[in-house]
Amino acid sequence: MTNNPKWWDNTVTIYNKYSDPITNVVRWYRTVVSGCFWKRTTEKISLNNSVLESDNVICRIPENENFRQKYDWLQIPNDQMQNYFTLGIGDIIVNGEVTDEINEYTAGARSSDVLKKYADLGTMTIESVRINTKTGVLFNRHYLAKGV
């Protein structure tokens, strides 16, 4: 049982990108996680009498026994990677449970297609990750992904 706040009520689909170092074939592994927090924000910056806007997404994922840090996940044999997930720069998160498989070699199934297809649900390409599993009373143990 988790002690996450009641507003951590989102289910997300995480797509982990893996490039085989021998064959250079790109594969994506999909994982669905529930009990997450999802928030889209717009950041405004004033610069030289102009206002620049940037959309950002924050996703908090509760601590999970199947999570591996990126380096450790990359050491897992290919036939077992689907049993675990990671969060790394360039990985994709969709706000909601989706079943699409990403295949960069098939038109309509590429990562760009999935991002476009689910834009209304909410998607992010991860730009930074923080592992908050040693936090104190103020926050629950979780992984924080930020992106656009």
Language-model features, listed with the residues they occupy:
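Short, conserved turn/kink motifs that form compact alpha/beta structural patches or helix kinks used as
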Residues: 27-148
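N-terminal intrinsically disordered, low-complexity, charge/repeat-rich segments that act as generic
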Residues: 1-34, 41-44
